[in-house]
Amino acid sequence: MDMKKNLWNKYTDEQLKELSDVTEQYKNCLNECKTEREAIEFTIEKAKEAGFKDLKEVISEGKKLNTGDRVYACCMNKSIALFQIGKEPISYGMNILAAHVDSPRLDIKRNPLYETDGLAYLDAHYYGGLKKYQWVAEPLALHGVIAVSYTHLTLPTILRV
């Protein structure tokens, strides 16, 4: 029986360091991005570091996009599209790479608090592959926004518990 090649043993020290750097970046992303809004904020920060500019700002400044320009458009702080302007006219088509944000979490329902058998419970939806029993052994944090309806503002808030 033929053994499959184990490429792990063939990595150079430089490749192992690069792999370690990428995994640390990924872990940092998972730690920073507990909600869609946090993930979009993180993505915008990284996009700016890579030379992307906000499309709204480009338009408001009356600038023209040129070949190679990088721009992003954010919608309601919950989704983002990033573009790199190509050489050919848009009428020739475009390449699209798409992804979605999936934040494993518990969403607390409206009026979530109830009592049964002398214990207080929170009624919640769970998303992103969580199992009902997984989260009880993990340190929890409340992440989200507070919507202030009379001012049309949303205020990000994080409360670690």
Question: Where is each model-derived feature located?
Answer:
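N-terminal capping segment at the start of a domain
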Residues: D2-E36
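A generic local secondary-structure boundary/capping motif
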Residues: R70-Y72, G86, L130-W135, V145, ...
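Short polybasic amphipathic segments
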Residues: L140-A147
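Hydrophobic or amphipathic alpha-helical targeting/insertion segments
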Residues: P104-L106, L113, D117
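Acidic/His- and Gly-rich active-site-bordering loop/insert found
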Residues: D54, I59-I108
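Conserved small/polar residues in nucleotide/adenosyl-binding loops
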Residues: T151-T157
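A gly/proline- and charged-residue-enriched helix-loop-helix capping module
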Residues: L119-A137
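Alpha/propeptide regions of enzymes that mature by internal proteolysis
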Residues: Q25-E57
